[in-house]
Amino acid sequence: SNCADHRVPDDETCLKMIIGEVERLPTSAAPYYRRGVDPSPPRFSADETSSLFPIDYRHAYDMRQVLARLVDDGLFREMAPEVGPEMICGVGRVGGLYTGFIGNNPGLTPHPVLRGEQRPGSILYRDGIAKISQFSRCCNDDGIPIVWLHDISGFDIGPEAEKQGLLGYGSSLIYTNSTNTVPMITVLLRKASGAGYYAQAGMPYDPVAQLATTISRLSVMDGRTLAIGAFNTKLDDNFEIVAETDEEREKIRRGMDAVEARITEDMDPVKAARQMDVDEVVRFSEIRSYLETLVEAAYQGCGYRRVKNPRIWSLHDIAVLGEGGS
């Protein structure tokens, strides 16, 4: 019936023939793109990664210390750190292969306009969005896979954001990630909430893999944020409860706590995996090894790849990044 090309006596022989057929395929492109650079372990042990994260997810940590435990030799070329400092982007090697990294920078960062003022990180502001959009396009143009490190609460909101046209910048980022053809890998380090999760190559935008850690909190809206929204008419400008009696105050507090607890329960990473919202739940110490495998797979393309030479991007690209979205 011509449904098979070979007839074999047993499974063992069949497996040997399959191995032989695979050996005849074109070899991996990875050795070529290493360009004589041998894979190296990170400068700091990946086993230390979990110690970088505070127990309370509202407390900050240093994303650059996380990167030092993911890239070869801890070497990372950061692009435009002075522009949109709430976002970190640059290139390092994973297993000897160029890899683009884009991550949120938790903690307070200097306000770009109000001198002496600071604003919270883990939020997408205009300049940061412009920077990572341009960087994402640069990586796509050169065929460099991108790793997104999520610790995102969402987009900036309010009159200032509207005046800056933040919606247009956000649309540009979403369009960029929707049209990229390089493999993108998403790692949910701690929290991934709201439209920021989607814009940073979340699962709906088809990353080749989405990894969650054991403390990841994936949600459309953070529990505390939803509680504030639900009880907004009972709160002042500082989100403190306004009530005439202690009984009323306690009732509002219990209601807010109940909303927050329900959403927090739904944020469980194992539950997200069961719902196929993530591909794998991994320990912090395993992230590096997973990235080695995924990045190697990204360079397994047979034949044509768009990386033309060892350059990372052109001088024009660097000039655009320096403009900071202006």
Identify the role of each PLM range.
Residues 1-326:
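Ligand-binding clefts of soluble mixed alpha/beta catalytic domains
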